[in-house]
Regions:
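Intrinsically disordered or compositionally simple regulatory linkers and C-terminal tails
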Residues: 3-5
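Short, structured coil/loop segments at alpha-helix boundaries
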Residues: 1, 23-24, 71-75
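Short, well-ordered alpha-helical segments
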Residues: 39, 51, 55-58, 66-86
Length: 115
């Protein structure tokens, strides 16, 4: 699969990220780097530990990475989760985290399919 096909599969905004990164090879490079980003595992762990502060930081980081890479499919639920956690509560966090997880898995699967 091409990187453009990857973005299409995950429902992300390839054209937007192309404006920022200028080339398909740069997009591919940074998308692959996302596979080693630790913000999602930190978010998952922090939520299990009910550590709102750490969960907020991890969600905020993940949100920023998604925005920079044009992963709009993952950005939106991560944004919503970040706002829930910003209020200092876990109320509603599980539901948003479930949506984040769904989109995260779609994103990871699509990136791994890039040749």
């Amino acid at each position: 699969m091409t990187i453009q096909g990857c973005y299409k599969k995950m429902g992300a905004d390839y054209e937007d990220v192309l404006k920022r990164l200028y080339s398909e090879s740069m997009i591919r490079k940074f998308a692959r780097m996302f596979l080693t980003d630790d913000s999602y595992p930190k978010l998952e762990r922090s939520l299990k530990e009910e550590n709102v502060e750490e969960a907020f930081r991890a969600a905020h980081t993940l949100k920023g990475v998604c925005q920079n890479l044009g992963f709009t499919n993952l950005y939106q639920p991560t944004y919503e989760l970040t706002e829930v956690l910003r209020a200092g509560t876990l109320k509603g966090a599980k539901e948003w985290f479930d949506r984040v997880t769904e989109q995260y898995n779609i994103t990871i699967e699509a990136i791994r399919a890039v040749q």
